[in-house]
Amino acid sequence: MKPTRILSILTIASAVLLCSCQAQKPSFVRVEDGQFVCENYPSHFVGTNFWYGAILGSEGVGGDRARLEAELDTLKALGMTNLRVLVGGDGPDGIPTRVSPTLQKEPGVYNDTIFWGLDYLLAEMAERNMKAVLYINNSWEWSGGYGMYLEWAGAGKALIPAEVGYTAYCNSVSEFVTNEKAKEFFYDHVRHVVSRTNTVTGKPYKDDPAIFSWQIGNEPRCFRPDSLGQAAFVDFMWTTAALIKSLDPNHLVSSGSEGRHGCEGSLPLWEKVHSCPDIDYMNIHIWPYNWSWVRENTLKTNLPIAIANTDEYINEHLAIAEKYGKPVVLEEFGFPRDDFQFAQGTPTTSRDAYYKHVFSRIEESAKAGGLFAGLNFWGWGGLASQSETNIYWQPGDDYCGDPAQEQQGLNSVYACDESTIAVIKTATEAISKALLPEARFVLEQNAGIFEGEGPHTLEVSLNAAREVEADFELEVSTDFGEAVQTFSKSAELVKGPNGLAFDLGLEPGFYKAVLYIVRNGVRTELARTNLGFDPEQIISAQDKQPDFEEFWSNTLQELASVAPEYKLIPLKEHSNDVREAFRVEMKSLGGETISGLLYMPVAEGKYPAMISYMGYGSDVWYADPSSNPQMIEFMLCIRNQAFNRQPGEKDDWCARGIADKNTYYYRGAFADAVRAIDFVCSLDKTDTDRVFASGESQGGALTFAAASLDDRLKAIAPSAPFLCDYPDYFVLAGWPGDPIKAAAKEAGMSDEDMYKVLSYFDIKNFTDRIQCPVIMAIGLQDPVCPPHTNFAAYNHIKTEKSWICYPLSGHNVWQQEGWPVAKEDFFEKYL
């Protein structure tokens, strides 16, 4: 064991552990309506096999408590809180392919260091809110199990498959279920284990919530096709389950079965075992390699076969589970590394793909509240080092997921297996999320904007896949991130639709509301939204400089002095007999060539004209020339953008020329917006009493600027307007503030000087000049042009005005289904 590796993995895990590994008071798991329930909350889980946990916890041979604690921390951080653990091995140490040290040396004679290790393991798991499935027996040789009990009962020496062959081994251990003396030795062992009191906590095992369930054994089999043998096997399983329940009624009991494969291929036999009323849930195992679905040289090519067979195997067992309403746990599955390698760090492409598929089955079941409730992959190698010489485990080697009879690294998942670890982490997070009730804020009635005297009621719609008792918190903060208030509610959710309501009384402004569910002291986010309260009362004072009007008057005079030199280039491929398309070029402020796309009706007459101002960095899009046959449409490309952008040109326009108001990019861009009006009004077919404009984002800002600088626009419809309220804008959004501030710093400007320059181009300083009707659309969730900045400009408009809020929209307001119709209805008033 390398201490540095422990430290490194702990560093990775610490961020998660700080918030989620608080010591909570756990409770016993129970089954209700086919669901695992703990602390009144159902549990679908991803766990792992950690068979050697009790050995690591001991202070004797093989013990390594520092590693144990590091492994538990890592597993907890990865979201795996269910560990399947061997109580202890049986028989003397030193037997080939048997793990050591063992727990039970002879019937009723124990190596207490292993028991103390198990005590320590359970105590440490309890501290982390983790739970153990403890299996007591084993049908295989690697921990003694059946063969050792038969040897103690005088049935001959326990055989080793590697020495005598698989068939001979199976024949010998098939006697276990009919050997009364061997079974009685085991029943005595069960009594001793289940009745134990933990020496670390002083708590009887039967009262320890760190135990998820008792398990009869690892892959218990009857190894016999005859009806008498199978009946004896069923009797053994039922008797053991009843014995455990009589000793400990608090904990679940499970079989440890592989499913049909471990029941001589008989689903009815598996069903009979699990119909036992003392067996609380059903187990299956799946081994694509061991069962020859894939071989060493077909791990990749036969992966689809393995996945298909896996689904079939799961489904056929779930069909039986439905009859009894019992959960199913796939508590063992594994897949070899690529090219059948064993070394840490070798690729695991096929394993990762197989794991992803199996994990997806649990996620689907969790969402639906299904009976497929948990899985434990085999097995956790964690921080183990690998021997440079031993393929199979030898005393002194680190324990890993592969017991002594298997190649070390065959099925182990090590902490350094980054791709597999990422798959596991993604799965545990997805399953945890799937277990939560679905939540959304009900914003349809008022679009998330509350007006008038409060308090106002914010409703939340919840959909639960199962009955849940839960605590909820609603955290409200300003859009600047300042905490306002946290509201708490407890609720008993029924399966299906539910609702919560919170009464809010807030000052004018925009806010962030986040809904959390609280479990075991840990908050998990369910939903978030932005909200607005009386946005038309938001006060964002103008900061016009004394020469603001003079500056723009001079700019417009300078623009007027530039001959436009309009040039229309026909675009026949985008024209028809209804409207003709042209690429337009013209001169603007400073002699800069700008351009645009024009659609003009073919028929003679006077037509209304619509100017479209484009978003930041947008490309020109070509319309159907027949779409608006009675409309002139002109899409402006401002300087350096769209048609005017040079190959390889950076999109840093928002920061260009920031050192001086006369050189700042948007002085020219705003002049370009006015030049577009000049052009449209110059057309013979334009009805100059019906010239309108609209634009999105940057186009929204240009629409506002154009209307404030030129009264020839008769109505405008900006959406998600850009460039509003710079001082607040740069706090609320990272862009465009970051590049502008960086350019200002490079130019040696103070913040005060930067904001002074920007004030000449702040849309809120323009909108009081607008003389035409306005309709504005905003996205309530817009992170690029936050609603606060939209209303900073809107609230200075003095003419007829209205606004529309799309409560679920981010910045893409122009894609909202209702906005084109709303614009059309608005402009229809003035056509």
Each language-model region and where it sits:
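C-terminal catalytic histidine-bearing segment of alpha/beta-hydrolase fold enzymes
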Residues: G379, A384-I391, F791-L831
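Cap/lid segment of the alpha/beta-hydrolase catalytic domain
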Residues: S618-A671, D728-G737
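Hydrolase active-site cap/lid region
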Residues: G700, F704-M749, C805
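N-terminal targeting or regulatory segments adjacent to alpha/beta-hydrolase or S9 domains
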Residues: P437-V578
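Short beta-strand/loop motif that positions the catalytic acidic residue
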Residues: I770, M776-I778
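Short beta-strand element of the alpha/beta-hydrolase
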Residues: L598-M600, K606-Y616
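Active-site mouth of glycoside hydrolases
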Residues: P26-W293, N302-P327, F333-A353, H357, ...
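N-terminal cap/lid segment of alpha/beta-hydrolase-fold proteins
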Residues: A560-A603
